[in-house]
């Protein structure tokens, strides 16, 4: 009898442990399970095929020599021979736009640099995507389109060499305050379009003339242990619109263990703009975006939804440390665009920022058109929890007849606000506040 009781007790303990383990599943904000795909995994470069070292195929170790054609020839050769890894050895290689083909990958050895030439004519105009619209625009320095299984790896550097472009941008702004980003004619650093199973690992992506890494209509992208930087000083040579990562109509994106410091948003969730943006097949939602274990220097927003965004669902920013950010979570609400920002969670954040939460209308370069059935924009199920942050303003949020805020949760917050401690949530429909200290 005692033996039966003991066995029953052990079985109960095992079942309880199993239930406990089951209860600890990692979940998206909407309650669905985060799949095992989102585990960080180091790429195996050796498994990607034959290595094509640039200097073994006619590319010179002369940092002043423009070698776009020679480098592209190596990429084309690898593609023609069934694919492989384009290896950038130690040294600096000056280039214009490069186009990767199916089966090819880029690996930058430590001390190896691809440096962008600072003349726009070396970045040909192509069918492209910028600022929430499909249009003709300049190619990036590194381009990948329609590829399955593309990777950029190694401890080397892709340097946009953007200073000439930055200075010319600010000169334009001196005589024309309404000069737009597109009119300034600048190349992005990396543009990856219509690709699946993409890995960017360990590389340094610096000094982009425009956006740093733009993902458009991609699925299953991992950006791991990468370093993103563009300067925010001095005023006449800071890097305008140098977003670190632009996620544009993408599904399943992991950003893990990165450092980000740029003169614009760190991670910007995009997807389309305009009064009929929700009906344009070129636009669409972003789903299942996980940003974790990152460090932030100066940025305009650690996580920004918009300004060109239509629908974002299951967006998580967690386990990060911030220093000198202007905003931690920024929800840009365009009056001219129907927007749905749903199930967004900010969890376990430490450090300092000017604003913790910022939700206001965004009207830069917007164009309101007549639409009888214009949907009301919404921000729904927004959660901030487990934060220990120093800031000037904690709650920089305002009401508007152009959007509705609902189901906001504030839980376990320890906030030091040096300028504005106000926390008026009366205009939010459904608010949960638990263990919040603002001093």
Regions from the language model: what does each represent?
Residues 87, 119-120, 127-129, 199, ...:
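Mature catalytic domains of secreted/periplasmic carbohydrate-active enzymes
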Residues 21-30, 173-175, 206, 265, ...:
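Short charge-dense sequence patches
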Residues 97-100, 113, 117-118, 140-145, ...:
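Glycine-rich beta-solenoid repeat tracts in large extracellular/virion proteins
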Residues 110-111, 148-157, 196-207, 219-233, ...:
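Right-handed parallel beta-helix
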Residues 15-16, 213, 267, 385:
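A general, composition-driven signal for non-globular sequence regions
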Residues 1-6, 10-87, 92-194, 201, ...:
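Extracellular "leader-to-stem" segments immediately downstream of a signal peptide or signal-anchor
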Residues 65-68, 285, 378:
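Electropositive phosphate-/nucleotide-binding environments in soluble metabolic enzymes
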């Amino acid at each position: 009898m005692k033996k039966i009781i003991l066995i029953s007790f052990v079985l109960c303990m095992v079942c309880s442990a199993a239930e406990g383990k089951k209860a600890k599943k990692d979940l998206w904000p909407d309650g669905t399970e985060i799949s095992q795909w989102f585990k960080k995994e180091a790429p195996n470069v050796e498994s990607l095929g034959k290595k094509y070292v640039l200097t073994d195929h006619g590319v010179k170790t002369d940092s002043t020599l423009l070698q776009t054609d020679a480098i592209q020839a190596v990429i084309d050769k690898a593609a023609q021979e069934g694919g492989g890894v384009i290896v950038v050895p130690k040294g600096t290689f000056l280039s214009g736009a490069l186009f990767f083909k199916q089966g090819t990958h880029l690996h930058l050895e430590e001390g190896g640099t691809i440096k962008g030439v600072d003349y726009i004519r070396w970045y040909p105009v192509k069918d492209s995507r910028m600022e929430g619209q499909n249009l003709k625009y300049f190619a990036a320095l590194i381009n990948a389109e329609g590829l399955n299984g593309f990777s950029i790896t190694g401890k080397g550097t892709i340097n946009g060499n953007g200073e000439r472009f930055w200075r010319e941008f600010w000169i334009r702004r001196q005589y024309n305050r309404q000069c737009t980003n597109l009119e300034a004619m600048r190349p992005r650093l990396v543009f990856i379009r219509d690709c699946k199973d993409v890995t960017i690992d360990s590389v340094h992506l610096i000094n982009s003339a425009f956006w740093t890494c733009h993902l458009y209509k991609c699925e299953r992208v991992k950006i791991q242990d990468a370093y993103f930087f563009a300067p925010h000083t001095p005023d006449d040579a800071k890097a305008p619109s140098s977003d670190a990562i632009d996620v544009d109509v993408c599904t399943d994106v992991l950003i893990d263990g990165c450092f980000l410091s740029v003169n614009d948003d760190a991670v910007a969730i995009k997807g389309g703009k305009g009064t009929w943006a929700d009906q344009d097949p070129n636009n669409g939602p972003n789903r299942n975006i996980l940003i974790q274990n990152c460090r932030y220097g100066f940025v305009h927003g650690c996580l920004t939804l918009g300004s060109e965004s239509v629908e974002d669902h299951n967006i998580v920013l967690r386990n990060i440390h911030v220093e000198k950010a202007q905003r931690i979570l920024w929800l840009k609400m365009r009056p001219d665009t129907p927007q749905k920002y749903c199930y967004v969670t900010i969890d376990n954040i430490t450090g300092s920022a000017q604003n913790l939460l910022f939700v206001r209308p965004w009207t830069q370069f917007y164009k309101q058109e007549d639409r009888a059935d214009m949907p009301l924009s919404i921000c729904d199920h927004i959660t901030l929890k487990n934060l220990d942050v120093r800031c000037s303003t904690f709650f920089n949020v305002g009401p508007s007849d152009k959007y509705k805020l609902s189901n906001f949760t504030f839980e376990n917050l320890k906030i030091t606000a040096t300028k504005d401690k106000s926390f008026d949530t009366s205009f939010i429909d459904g608010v949960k506040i638990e263990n919040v200290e603002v001093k």
